[in-house]
Curated annotation (Swiss-Prot):
GO cellular component, one term: cytosolic large ribosomal subunit
Protein name: Large ribosomal subunit protein uL22
GO terms of molecular function: rRNA binding; structural constituent of ribosome
Highest taxon of the lineage: Bacteria
Presence of keyword rRNA-binding: yes
Organism, as annotated: Borreliella afzelii (strain PKo)
């Protein structure tokens, strides 16, 4: 019988645009933990560093709750990047005008999974 165990981690209101983080998340979805960390470490993007922290946190949660689990047995089940809070600022322009500057944040949700066979 195959039993799935899932462990999660969330990063809320992280200072990066979701539009820039989603392509990075697509690169690691479905990969093993070791490969995902290798891919994220090699990327120079700010979003990759944020995603790396959340993935490491999810793997750490998994290894904390299941002592028999190793890094090789973990893979990335799901990565979700959603819009976070937006900070709007006024940007003064010429001739007394003003533009709005929107700073976007994102929420990152990572779910890791481990599979093991149970006989009986």
């Amino acid at each position: 019988m195959l039993v799935n165990r899932r462990y999660t981690a969330k990063g809320k209101n992280l200072p990066a645009s979701p539009k820039k983080v989603r392509p990075i998340a697509d690169n690691i979805r479905g990969k093993s933990y070791v490969k995902a960390i290798a891919v994220l470490c090699s990327m120079p993007n700010k979003g990759a560093k944020l995603l790396e922290k959340v993935v490491k946190s999810a793997a750490s949660n998994a290894m904390y709750h299941n002592k028999n689990l190793s890094e090789d047995m973990i893979f990335i089940k799901m990565v979700m990047v959603d819009d976070g809070r937006r900070r709007k600022k006024i940007w003064p322009r010429a001739r007394g005008r003003a533009d709005r500057l929107v700073n976007r944040n994102c929420h990152i949700f990572v779910e890791v999974d481990e599979k093991k066979d149970i006989k009986g």
